[in-house]
A protein has these predicted regions:
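Conserved helicase ATPase motor motifs in RecA-like P-loop NTPase domains
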Residues: 1-27
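Short glycine-/polar-rich loops that comprise or flank the Walker A/P-loop
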Residues: 8-10, 51-55, 103-105, 145-148, ...
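Loop/turn-to-beta-strand initiation segments
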Residues: 8-14, 80, 129-132
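Interdomain hinge/linker at the junction between the two RecA-like core domains of SF2 helicases
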Residues: 19-76
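Conserved RecA-like helicase motor-core motifs
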Residues: 33-42, 101-117
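Conserved RecA-like helicase motor core of SF1/SF2 enzymes
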Residues: 111-119, 129-187
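C-terminal accessory region of SF2 helicases/translocases
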Residues: 147, 161-164, 170-329
């Protein structure tokens, strides 16, 4: 898209809370020289932003479950707490443990809710924060929420920064407690292990309270060599995808084709399934020609997960139907 608008003398604006230097170079290499606007330490108003202190960080050994007693105690002493896990099953386990320990004002948010239900949950969060929200990476994007404290599984620094951004969001309170654990619950890694390790090491070198500029500097140090390994391969595969390379040949005026979503999904390897409890409603929407409404009942699942979900799947239908209790666990 950026290439296309640039070739047609239009403007394109990139906005990001985390823009490591290597990303800037990649954008310039692929498009054209770009004017980057960032807060300047020499400007007083910008300096106030860069020096803003919103968080007190603690790096804690172990994972969320091994520290669940301390987390529950902290939850009971706070009005609102955010816990972010890297995997849906991990978030479900943590949610169940917290409920078992007497915290009833709790919400769960992850990518295995169908779009309809996820939108409903997000709407309730905008109206009132629960005592605790257990979420996955979905909380990093779009949600304008402000928790009093946060706990997170280990992740790359850019993801950590986004998670911190949901705690003491406006910086109007004294620095809030944020805890990052050194281990995750799941044995499966969705992030580059070296990047996660470097992120934790760099965070450990910081002094409290954290300044915004501290986190920007950490992101640049962690990504000083750019992408590598699987991350670089994934980037190149998406960049060289035929839908991007040959977009001019496929361009039809007035026709909308969600090629970006298709590329991302194929790169990430996801497939949309229909929960069995929603099959009747899906059929009703389809019969009425309500295609958008029916699609909002589908749930994205990583293709890599299908190998151990076979007993829950009915592949005779289109879309495939999955037993609902698996998703609700």
């Amino acid at each position: 898209t950026a290439r296309f608008v640039n070739e047609n003398n239009a403007s394109c604006l990139f906005l990001s809370a985390t823009m490591p230097n290597f990303i800037k170079k990649m954008l310039e290499d692929e498009i054209m020289p770009i004017e980057f606007v960032a807060p300047s330490p020499s400007d007083q108003s910008d300096r106030e932003i860069l020096e803003k202190k919103r968080h007190n960080l603690k790096i804690c050994d172990g994972d969320v479950l091994t520290n669940i007693a301390d987390i529950v105690a902290a939850i009971k002493n706070s009005n609102s707490t955010l816990i972010v896990c890297n995997h849906v099953p991990s978030a479900q386990l943590v949610f169940e443990e917290i409920r078992k320990k007497g915290v009833t004002d709790a919400k769960l948010l992850h990518s295995r809710f169908c779009r309809r239900d996820r939108d409903a949950i997000e709407k309730t969060l905008q109206e009132r924060l629960p005592k605790v929200l257990v979420a996955t990476q979905v909380v990093e994007v779009s949600l304008d929420v402000d928790f009093e404290q946060g706990f997170s599984e280990p992740a790359p620094i850019d993801a950590i920064i986004q998670r911190f951004g949901r705690v003491n969001r406006k910086g109007e309170r004294s620095p809030a407690k944020v805890v990052v654990f050194t281990e995750q619950i799941s044995k499966y890694n969705i992030y580059n292990k070296d990047i996660v390790s470097r992120s934790i090491t760099e965070l450990q070198s910081l002094s409290n309270p954290l300044r915004e500029i501290d986190l920007i500097d950490v992101a640049n140090r962690v990504y000083k060599c750019g992408y590598s390994g699987e991350d670089l391969e994934r980037y190149n595969n998406a960049l060289n995808h035929p839908l991007i390379k040959c977009y001019k040949e496929r361009l039809i005026a007035g026709f909308h084709y969600d090629w970006t979503e298709q590329i991302i999904e194929k790169t990430d390897g996801t497939i949309e399934l229909l929960p069995r409890c929603l099959a009747t409603k899906y059929a009703e929407y389809q019969a009425q020609g309500l295609w958008l409404e029916s699609n909002r009942l589908l749930v994205p699942i990583r293709a890599a997960s299908l190998s151990y979900l076979s007993e829950y799947l009915n592949k005779n239908d289109d879309p495939w139907i999955i037993k609902s209790y698996f998703l609700a666990r």
